[in-house]
Amino acid sequence: MNEKNSLGLNKCFLDLDDPFKLFESWYEEAKKNEINDPNALALGTATKQGVPSVRMVLLKGYDKNGFVFYTNLNSQKGNEIKENPNATMCFHWKSLLRQIRIVGTLSQVEDEVADNYFNSRAYESRIGAWASKQSSELVNREELIKSLEKFKNKYQDQNNVPRPNHWSGWNLKPTSIEFWLDGDNRIHERLKYKLTANNEWTKSLLSP
């Protein structure tokens, strides 16, 4: 096995029944080693007809209830989630030669949670949430710049920019979490946790 992956998944299979503990361990290591955006993940969604789409978003929180990101609710992903709450996340940390895939169901976070995170953002980011009609077509770039200036004039007090109703967070409650380690000669290691109907986690090693 690659030296960077000294924590073998076979040992995790024997010792760890909680996938969140393993996620936390890997995520903390990624924050120390990944050069750019260790919280970046590929988010896969689909329409109610099953047409898929994927994009990069940033993880902004997690606990045993799920994994949280924020977005414009009227964006393409927002509209797809409203139609079909089933989604998947994939973290890939090249510096560690590790990957985590998460499958689950999305639900909107509470308003108070969204408000608290929104208020922690930089002023320009909060203004951007008002100005950008995410995923809609622009006549030109100037249209967006004018919208930014409009909302800067409207909300000149940087400490008093309310959260737009069209902007909030989504929480992915996982039903499966798979951990992947790079191995020599493509003999990778895979460990998958699945949530049972009794709300308990089972685990199994998978062939690469």
Which residue stretches match the model-derived regions?
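Binding-site signature for planar aromatic cofactors or substrates
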Residues: 1-208
